[in-house]
From Swiss-Prot:
The keyword RNA-binding applies. PROSITE patterns: RIBOSOMAL_L22. The gene is rplV. Keywords: Ribonucleoprotein, Ribosomal protein, RNA-binding, rRNA-binding. InterPro entries: Ribosomal_uL22, Ribosomal_uL22_bac/chlpt-type, Ribosomal_uL22_bac/org-type, Ribosomal_uL22_CS, Ribosomal_uL22_sf. This is Large ribosomal subunit protein uL22. Part of the 50S ribosomal subunit. It comes from the Bacteria. Belongs to the universal ribosomal protein uL22 family. GO terms for cellular component: cytosolic large ribosomal subunit. This protein binds specifically to 23S rRNA; its binding is stimulated by other ribosomal proteins, e.g. L4, L17, and L20. It is important during the early stages of 50S assembly. It makes multiple contacts with different domains of the 23S rRNA in the assembled 50S subunit and ribosome.
Length: 110
């Protein structure tokens, strides 16, 4: 049985979020949470929140045992990009891309 959780339209670049998600893929829940507790990245609180949501879904919706849960899938997809402009010298403007991410985590019993 699998339990899923996701966060869509999160305002962080997918490349940065993938660095954190790659650390917890395939790990047991306790180990994944301890890794996230000591990871100093901007995406860590977002990934931790999604992981805790997947754990809560597994416990509440499917009556799974938390001690046996493993992160089976963890991936980040690219969301829509917000385009902004920054004024530059001589009346020009340059574009700034504010990227968004969709974070997905799937946990299951081993």
């Amino acid at each position: 049985m699998q339990s899923k959780a996701s966060a869509n339209m999160v305002r962080i670049a997918p490349r940065k979020a993938r660095l954190v998600v790659d650390l917890i893929r395939g790990k047991q829940i306790g180990e994944a949470l301890s890794i996230l507790a000591y990871t100093n990245k901007a995406a860590t609180p977002i990934v931790e929140k999604v992981l805790k949501s997947a754990i809560a879904n597994a416990e509440h919706n499917f009556d799974m045992n938390i001690e046996n849960l493993v992160v089976t899938e963890a991936y980040v997809n690219e969301g829509p990009t917000l385009k902004r402009f920054r004024p530059r010298a001589m009346g020009r403007a340059s574009r700034i891309n504010k990227r968004t991410s969709h974070v997905h985590i799937v946990v299951s019993e081993k």
